[in-house]
Amino acid sequence: MFTLTPSAFAARDIEFVHKNKTEIVYLNNGSYITITLISKDISTLSLTSTDSATFTKVGNKVVTCRDKKGNLEWEYTLFAEFSVVENVSATCTSATYSQTIYASDWSFSNGNATKSGNTAYGVGTFKRKVLFVTVDTANIDISISCDVYGNLS
């Protein structure tokens, strides 16, 4: 889930639940947020005695913010790795994040990535300040899950 907390200059709350591979949320100030899920199989490792394929699945969920001119302001990426025994189990084995700020009026805090079962979670907060006053806040709260077939969502 992605939540943008409005400031005095914003007109409404925007809550985003990722359902597709790529989504775009347009903000009332002309900026927009893009959320993209990227996935790939790393390798087919083995077959178990029940002939279930065992493989590693890697996924990234990238959240970017651009201003109304299309200039990149910031980016947050959740990286996740899953071990999948096809049709049997999926386990998140690694969860990390990265963030990059491109516009100097934004800052980042409270970043973290965790894993539990078949899901990776990423959180963090971007804030934009003008004359030392916070005018925009973007709270990142996203996840990547893997099913027993290696499908990421």
Give the location of each predicted region.
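N-terminal prepro-regions of secreted/extracellular proteins
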Residues: 1-70
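Mature secreted bioactive peptide module from preproproteins
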Residues: 48-153
